[in-house]
Amino acid sequence: MVLVAPQQEQGALWSPSPPTPGSGAFVVEAGRPAPAPSEAGRPAPARDEVLALLRDGSGQRPRFDPGLSGGLRAWLEDAAADLVARRGEDAPPLFLGPRFLWNDPVAAADPVGTAVDPVGTATDPYPTGWVRSCLIRALFAQVVTTGQVDSPLGDALDALRVDPGRSAMARHVDELPGEARSALAASLRIHIENLMNLTPRFAAGWLPRTHDRVAIPLAGGRVVLNGVFDLLVGAPVPGRATLCALGLTTGGRWAQARTALHYLALLETLRSGTPPFRLALLHSAAGRYGVEDVLEEHLRTIVSHVVVQLSTLGDRDA
């Protein structure tokens, strides 16, 4: 496999950029025979290779030191206690999602946003990138569940309308001028075409679950690390890495999207005591994907990053 991630490291397999039209068949190789082209001469869907990479080595899934999670949490608790001391005991709880790991939230890998980690501002409550990201994630959940999308914009809006936290966004899209709405619909068609090619079709035994929320309270709940997995598959087994996590980026910086996925892997480690086995990152705008093992060094690196960022917060964040 051609490696185009920022740098090569153990356990990481990254796809090349998608081929340009007319450049011929594109077959990914990753240490095993690549899926055979279809009878029409087209390459097999990338989702077959993503699934193969997630399954590879599943019979020898690693065990982790039972004390790993406790050690990581202790490190974070110390940093959170220092932050609480700076903010004051009466300060409201601080909810921190992956976006707090970089100083420029506008350049975030994906402006997902939640009720406690909003993206919009008073002057621009529904930034275009955020709206697009939410619509694409709604479609991604539909692809995982049903394997098909009939009307990208219509299906995505239907999903947002039944979500109390997103219904106002659906009304905002309904009220867009015709030209802006058409441009959004055209953009969604490109993203969903790539997602249909990238997203594996998981059997029920994989226990696929979308929008899996995780929150880790620190310092007695005064600091909460939180995030949302786009997709988790597998059943947790104490002491053994068994889960696979799939993350989605809709067009932001690849390195930041990967960091956000490592952050979520850390939260899962703190929640269950065991990290995920493997991570996959899908880029819906470019049609790229990457698959990597979760290593202890990834977890320690992301904890170090979190601790550094916590040390920069204080009274201004209250």
List where the protein language model places each region:
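C-terminal, charged and often intrinsically disordered regions of DNA end-processing helicases
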Residues: 1-135
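An acidic intrinsically disordered interaction segment
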Residues: 80-100, 219-236, 295, 310
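Short amphipathic alpha-helical face segments that pack within enzyme cores
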Residues: 134-135, 259-267
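Non-catalytic protein-protein interaction segments used by genome-maintenance enzymes to assemble
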Residues: 210-262
